Design a protein with these regions (language model features):
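Hydrophobic transmembrane alpha-helices of multi-pass small-molecule transporters
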Residues: 1-59, 71, 76, 118-197, ...
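A short, solvent-exposed beta-strand micro-motif common in secreted/extracellular proteins
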Residues: 93-99
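Membrane-embedded alpha-helical segments and adjacent helix-loop junctions characteristic
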Residues: 152, 165-166, 170-274, 434-514
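Interfacial segments of multi-pass membrane proteins
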Residues: 174-178, 306-314, 510, 550-553
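Alpha-helical transmembrane segments and, especially, the helix-loop junctions at the ends
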Residues: 202, 242-257, 275-319, 333-342, ...
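Membrane-water interface of transmembrane alpha-helices
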Residues: 209-213, 255-262, 341-352, 537-538
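Membrane-interface alpha-helices at helix entry/exit sites of multi-pass transporters
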Residues: 227-235, 268-282, 316-324, 515-520, ...
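C-terminal transmembrane helix pair
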Residues: 269-271, 327, 446-451, 455, ...
Length: 587
């Protein structure tokens, strides 16, 4: 084993240190203590008013609030303002408006904070519950340290000068050393509900692969399938995507690639075998990556997004809540990718040898034998876990019909119950836990939540969002497309979790400032960061597909770039319209 640093690592670390020092010195400093003017405007048919209040930002301990009442023709509003704000992390200026009478909407409320000199800031409601609107502004605090940490982490994540795990461990260390958060607060995200959910999902996925239930399911479906040639690719892609909803995309690709290779080997024509091999192998890779966006446990950015939605948007976002957002993406993109692969590699409509796949799959299925007791127990736990995930919080129309809104146990706790059950029944042992869990993914996810929290606590995310406020000159639908493109581009040079960590904390204040539904922007980013299909190094399924030797680098890049384009159009236009049509987001 080689110890020490390679020349590349030394260069990257040197660049990282220099960049960190430079941005620390040029980064915006924290807000100056003093008195500011807050102008609150409400423009609606039932109340039209503009009021100015004094607000102080101070260095010493302070927590003074005052309440005002604004009267309109048919709407009255009670306003509570924090008039004296201590300049510390996670201590925002808060304005609460409670309306009585005719309904107000968030876009009818705007606040302006100014010092009558160079500081001028426009604020809009961050959260809404019924007719209660909350405007929060976290002023810049420890901003130079926050910018330095973000720069260092971004360089190390993008360049992989040190391992992603090492960078993940560096994040809480820097957060504590720069006095942004206490050790308890900085380390708490490493077992955040999002991390616990993925951890429990990994345990269940490990049980499925250990007892070959995933392989059994895949062979069972393929042995019952019909069709040949190009239609068979769609079947294989559908099975792969379904598996990827519940187990890691790496595991689903690892299961389906050997099946695909066995199918390819049956084709006698060299030319047809070559074209079919490229399409089938890429189809497996793409669907393994795509399937992860369909469920909350399918990909780490999903629970990360849910964490921010629950914490900062005041929305109870459950496992069931994710399905109508993620599943349509898969259902729309899967056939589009399939048609593109057929066109790209000019596949014949039917291939005689593919009629044998049903027989091949059935023979392989029979080799597995009858289900032993262990497999049956895993199936029971798996189905029970899914049932509990779906019934955490039922849709309102179902809840009203049956008189039960759901059991209310969080998805993370349900996942842990499922994992614990597997260990109590000795279906999993310590070796399974140590070898079957992607600990690096959990560390990256936990550190990402810690970094995002630091960006929000120091006001950095709001500051960056304000610098992007120029996007307001564009229509909202175009802003959504731009943000989707940015997410896809960032994930081409960083992991999907890293991309989500950087973009989502910025997206919430950006959307609020532009008058766009923050839930819409968060969901677009969470899904778009999992849409990297162009590079072999982009996702593990792409790496596995490339390692088969069936597809060349040039072919993978050119084919994948079109899939990336399809993904951007589907996620930012078609699916967003569906979300709005069914009332999931406000367009």
């Amino acid at each position: 084993m080689d110890y020490g640093f390679s020349r590349k690592t030394v260069v990257i670390l040197a660049i990282t240190v220099i960049a960190g020092l430079v941005v620390y010195n040029v980064a915006p400093t924290q807000i100056e203590p003093g008195q500011y003017q807050l102008t609150l405007e409400i423009h609606s048919e039932s109340i039209y008013t503009s009021q100015t209040y004094n607000v102080s930002f101070v260095s010493e301990v302070a927590d003074d609030s005052i309440e005002y009442r604004l009267n309109g023709t048919s709407t009255n509003v009670t306003v509570t303002i924090t008039q004296s704000v201590e300049i510390t992390p996670d201590n925002p200026l808060q304005i609460t408006l409670e309306a009585f009478g005719d309904d107000l909407s968030a876009n009818e409320i705007v606040a302006t904070l100014t010092d009558n000199e160079s500081f001028n800031l426009t604020l809009r409601p961050n959260r809404q519950s019924g007719q209660t609107f909350i405007i929060e502004y976290q002023p810049l605090v420890n901003s130079q340290s926050a910018v330095m940490i973000l720069t260092v982490v971004a360089i190390l994540w993008f360049s992989e000068g040190i391992s992603l795990v090492a960078t993940s461990l560096l994040i809480p260390i820097l957060i504590v050393l720069t006095d942004i958060r206490s050790p308890q607060t900085a380390l708490a995200p490493f077992f955040d509900p999002a991390v616990a959910l993925i951890f429990g999902g990994f345990l269940i996925g490990r049980a499925l692969t250990k007892y070959e239930l995933d392989k059994r399911l895949a062979l069972l479906i393929l042995s019952r399938g019909e069709g040949s040639g190009s239609s068979l690719i769609l079947t294989v892609m559908g099975v792969t995507a379904f598996l990827s909803m519940w187990i890691s995309n790496t595991a689903s690709a690892a299961i389906m690639i050997p099946i695909a290779l066995a199918v390819i080997s049956r084709i006698r024509s060299v030319d047809v075998r070559d074209k079919y091999g490229k399409a089938l192998v890429l189809g497996v890779a793409y669907s393994a990556t795509l399937g992860g966006v369909a469920s909350l446990v399918g990909s780490p950015p999903n629970p990360l997004a849910a964490t921010y939605i629950n914490s900062f948007l005041g929305v109870q976002f459950s496992f069931m809540s994710w399905i109508p957002f993620g599943l349509p993406v898969v259902l729309i993109m899967l056939p589009l990718i399939w048609r593109w692969l057929i066109f790209r590699f000019k596949l014949p409509k039917g291939i005689e040898e593919m009629n044998e796949l049903k027989e091949i799959s059935y023979k392989e299925y029979l080799k597995l034998g009858p289900m032993p007791t262990e497999q049956k127990l895993v199936v029971v736990i798996f189905i029970s876990t899914i049932a509990l995930w779906f019934t955490e919080k039922l849709p309102d129309f179902i809840a009203h019909a049956i008189g039960w809104s759901g059991h209310g146990i969080s998805s993370a706790v349900v996942a842990l119950i499922g994992g614990l059950s597997l260990m109590i029944l000795r279906l999993l042992d310590e070796k399974d836990v140590s070898s079957g869990i992607s600990w690096s993914s959990l560390l990256i996810l936990g550190s990402g939540i810690a970094l995002g929290g630091a960006m929000i606590d120091t006001g950095l995310s709001s500051f960056i969002a304000l610098q992007m406020s120029g996007l307001g000159i564009f229509p909202s639908f175009l802003v959504v497309i731009i943000i989707g493109c940015i997410a896809v581009l960032v994930t081409m040079v960083a992991s999907n979790t890293g991309a989500a960590v950087i973009l989502i904390p910025i997206a919430i204040p950006l959307a609020t400032g532009l008058g766009i539904d923050p839930l819409l922007i968060v969901m677009v980013i969470a899904i778009a960061v999992s849409m990297d299909f162009a590079l072999p190094t982009g996702t593990p399924p792409s790496t596995i597909a490339y390692s088969t030797g069936k597809v060349e680098m040039r072919e993978m890049v050119t084919t994948g770039l079109i899939v990336d384009l399809i993904a951007i159009l589907v996620v930012t236009i078609i699916v967003v319209w569906l979300w709005g049509f069914f009332g999931l987001v406000v367009l």
